[in-house]
A protein has these predicted regions:
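Core catalytic alpha/beta fold that binds nucleotide/phospho-ligands
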Residues: 1-216
């Protein structure tokens, strides 16, 4: 069976022990306790996920992922993007570059403040017409889409936010400074809202979603 172009893996953040490389274990020792657990958990699940795609052991996956850096897969294993929130972890794998982001669907935050501080003039003008409940949902969606797009391209997230213009009609994001456009997908899955960004020349309607709730 031909593998799909895009697969995403979602799991709950139980922080159970996973298989990690010696290098990942060494890097984790330089992090705070919470950050170390989060790092080992996400990279361990990334190894597990890719191992199921490639039919190899998790420690054979050629993953290079220092803390704070975009993860890379060597040996033509494809592309990987990782995101986590308080309750879950999202791992995206594809044959092409991608960026992913995840957040709890009911996260409480100050939507008006985020809109006015981080979003473009065009977006503020468009979104300020909504009531608070609707506004919170759209501001959350835009944040997820923008962060996934940032992970696709790289750069500095906070400085890029106002340059990233979301177009809900054609499901694209324009970086008005770099004049680069990418596509996105956004959807709900269980307790989460998830976004995936990818290049304009890729046409995908639905990713294959894999969900894990096992204790390891």
């Amino acid at each position: 069976m031909k593998k799909p172009n895009l697969m995403i893996y979602v799991t709950k953040s139980s922080f159970k022990k996973m298989q990690n490389s010696n290098q990942e274990l060494e890097w984790s020792q330089k992090l705070s306790l919470i950050r170390s657990r989060e790092y080992l958990f996400s990279r361990g699940h990334a190894r597990y996920f890719i191992s199921t795609i490639k039919n190899i052991s998790p420690l054979e996956v050629p993953l290079f992922s220092p803390p704070g850096k975009p993860p890379t897969l060597k040996n033509n294993f494809g592309f990987l993007s990782i995101s986590h929130c308080k309750s879950g972890c999202l791992i995206g794998w594809s044959k092409f570059p991608l960026g992913v982001d995840i957040e709890n669907i009911n996260r409480d935050f100050l939507a008006k403040e985020i809109l006015n501080k981080y979003y473009s003039i065009e977006e503020r003008s468009l979104l300020n017409k909504y009531d608070l409940n609707k506004l919170k949902k759209i501001v959350l969606d835009y944040w997820l889409i923008k962060e996934a797009s940032f992970k696709l391209r790289g750069g500095n997230l906070l400085s890029e936010l106002k340059n990233l213009i979301v177009n809900q009609n054609n499901k694209t994001v324009l970086n008005k400074e770099l004049l680069l456009t990418n596509r996105y997908l956004i959807k709900s899955f269980k307790d989460w809202r998830i976004a995936v960004s990818f290049d304009m020349n890729i046409n995908i309607t639905e990713p294959l979603i894999c969900y894990s709730n096992f204790e390891s």
